[in-house]
Amino acid sequence: MSGVNRRDFLTAGSAFLSLAAEAELLAGPVPAGMVEEGKADQIGPDVYFHEGQVGDNSDAVCNNGWIIFEDYVLVIDANFPAGARLIISKIRSMTDKPIRFAFDTHHHGDHAYGNQVYVENGAVPVAHTGVIEEMKRHETGYYGGKPGAWEDAAKGRADVRDSKLKPPSVLFSKDLYFDDGKHRVELLHLGVAHTHGDALAWLPKERVLFTGDVCVNGPYNFVGDGDVGKWVVTLDAVKKLRPKIVGTGHGPRSVATVLDDQQAFFKSLRDEVGSLMANKSPDEAKGQVEGIRATLKGNAQIARYVSDQGAGDSFPSQVGKVYEELTGKKLAALSDHRRLARHAHARCHGLELA
């Protein structure tokens, strides 16, 4: 892989974990929508996908994956604490092999707050170094400052209140490989997208890709902690992997075309905001939001990414984020981060509330 300067090995049972960059030990495809909700769906030999459910009261909010190696299990995303317990129970119904690693694709609560549950069950949390950087920015309560994202999430989730934040303890700066000769999983950081610490899990033998929220399948894109322009570029790098099966961060699993669809949504959003809003003042620009929504809704390829008006409507905040990236100006009510967190999906991500 690119950027490989050295190779280290950590023993995991009788298997080996190879670190292909600077790793640090610090503390048959089914069409989208055809997977039974809550079911552990086998997508390859010893490879499973579980579709979560976006909602304030859901146990498993994000999608999960897991790979059963010869001597241990690697889980993709820790989920919330309740989701972690649910996924562990599903794994235990299949195998008694130890769960050694829980890989956080990024720092948001629905992907990382279950780390402590995995630690209690013998696993080590793993993530890109950017996850720690983001946690230091948003988890201020854990790092000795004012209450942060964890404390806000705890207000609405008993499972968070009853657990504690556990940052990942195995970190990598570019890529990290798990390979026991039978299975190979490559954890890859390909650029800024949904956050500044996103990483993916790539299974080259099976051509299965777990994207975290770098790619979702539905109206689930939260843009407050990332960069939409860079996200488009990162998706170019992701598409070069040419996966056959894509386990998205939210929504049904799919095939490689879901990467095209996600990218097309952001490209269209940037094009529309650029042409209709970029030369307008913030007050004038706000009036263009619903017209842009209608235009994108009219595009069959990307319509499912556009949220409807109502309590969980994230589209105005997406417009506001792109407007700010293009102009350097905020559309106050549309782009304020603390207001973004009031949206249902932002709450599910464990983001701060005002």
Question: Which residues are covered by each model-predicted region?
Answer:
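C-terminal regulatory/interaction regions
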Residues: 10, 282-354
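Conserved beta-strand hairpin/beta-sheet module of binuclear metal-dependent hydrolase folds
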Residues: 41-90, 199-211
